[in-house]
Amino acid sequence: MADSKTKKKCSFCGRSENEVGFLITGMNGYICDSCATQAYEITQEALGEGRKRAGATKLNLKELPKPVEIKKFLDQYVIGQDDAKRFLSVSVYNHYKRLLQKDSGDDVEIEKSNIIMVGSTGTGKTLLARTIAKLLHVPFTIVDATVLTEAGYVGEDIESILTRLLQVADYNVPEAEQGIVFIDEIDKIARKGDNPSITRDVSGEGVQQGLLKLLEGSVVNVPPQGGRKHPDQKMIPVNTKNILFICGGAFDGIEKKIAQRLNTHVVGYTASQKTAVIDKNNMMQYIAPQDLKSFGLIPEIIGRLPVLTYLNPLDRNALRAILTEPKNSIIKQYIKLFEMDGIKLTFEDSVFEYIVDKAVEYKLGARGLRSIVETIMMDVMFEIPSESKKEYKVTLDYAKQQLEKANMARLQIA
């Protein structure tokens, strides 16, 4: 009996029963615990590669939302900004039509139209991009341009943008190659003037140069887990040709560049007529590519962001609407949170007016509305889940009391 045991060995590695943890018996052989684990890992890796090769969700022109439908969807989540919505709706529709062109065998090749949105903080740039990705069910990621640096310097490599997109797409490469990347604060990587720099600018002009290959469409080797590249790391090739890049920035001070350009054009040429139609309270609507160049974006990157649109500054009426009207408005979110605890939350109308007044006073934009509401609601959200109340009404006096005891300086930089 002992002799028969010694003859048992793993059919894969050849080790005997005494040399392994245990043997699993099959119909015509054995496998040890070590080989079983290794076989499982190989199987999982092969299945993962198969999923990647399976490809992305097949686009269908009939199912692709038309520009009017895209705008209607945006209207449900974003208040105002009709011009920006129309630009985005048309550009996104044409971009995904372009992806279908490769199956048609047409001789006319449609070029990619990446987008740049200019507007003050809190006007809805990020929300617009996120909402479009939600409608189209494509991978979407947001990248802060301020953390990007040239390769070899402290900070994140340009390729880390694609690493994030891959992670969102669960490493399905074809799916990621149809995704949307929103690069926020693109204005922060502007060079310090209109002229090329003679010194090294690793987080400004250098990053712009690095972004060129991503924006124009090329195959980029991406580290799967992000971070710096090293020789032993397996790279994933990603083709950026069909990735839609949307860039956004506040471009603080660009109004002066626009005004200078308009004044230059006006002098000596029907000056009185042109000056009369210029809205000095909203200079962004007159923005042109040469203004971006004057601000510090290099001509090459401007050329790869051919769709330029602007977002209007939010007035008091727009902020009031943003607070309560969209499908996922801030107030509706808090009502839902309380509803999950079995509590009916209501507000006095004067509370909404007060919140908007403070957002205007501190120039916080739409993003600041949440900070103000959060400050007002913090104490009640802490206490009321432990109480037996079924209803709670936020009064103007309570809202004022909460904001007065809060650190308003913190809200001002929200």
Curated annotation (Swiss-Prot):
Keyword tags: ATP-binding, Chaperone, Metal-binding, Nucleotide-binding, Zinc
Cellular component GO terms, alphabetical: HslUV protease complex
Binding site for Zn(2+): C10, C13, C32, C35
Molecular functions per Gene Ontology: ATP binding; ATP hydrolysis activity; ATP-dependent protein folding chaperone; protein dimerization activity; unfolded protein binding; zinc ion binding
InterPro entries on file: AAA+_ATPase (IPR003593), ATP-dep_Clp_protease_ClpX (IPR050052), ATPase_AAA_core (IPR003959), Clp_ATPase_C (IPR019489), Clp_protease_ATP-bd_su_ClpX (IPR004487), ClpX_bact (IPR046425), P-loop_NTPase (IPR027417), Znf_CppX_C4 (IPR010603)
GO biological process: cell division; proteolysis involved in protein catabolic process
Domain ClpX-type ZB: from-to ranges: 1-51
HAMAP family: ClpX
Function: ATP-dependent specificity component of the Clp protease. It directs the protease to specific substrates. Can perform chaperone functions in the absence of ClpP.
PANTHER family, per the entry: ATP-DEPENDENT CLP PROTEASE ATP-BINDING SUBUNIT CLPX-LIKE, MITOCHONDRIAL (PTHR48102:SF7), ATP-DEPENDENT CLP PROTEASE ATP-BINDING SUBUNIT CLPX-LIKE, MITOCHONDRIAL-RELATED (PTHR48102)
Subunit field text: Component of the ClpX-ClpP complex. Forms a hexameric ring that, in the presence of ATP, binds to fourteen ClpP subunits assembled into a disk-like structure with a central cavity, resembling the structure of eukaryotic proteasomes.
Protein family membership: Belongs to the ClpX chaperone family.
Protein name as catalogued: ATP-dependent Clp protease ATP-binding subunit ClpX
Organism expressing this protein natively: Bacteroides thetaiotaomicron (strain ATCC 29148 / DSM 2079 / JCM 5827 / CCUG 10774 / NCTC 10582 / VPI-5482 / E50)
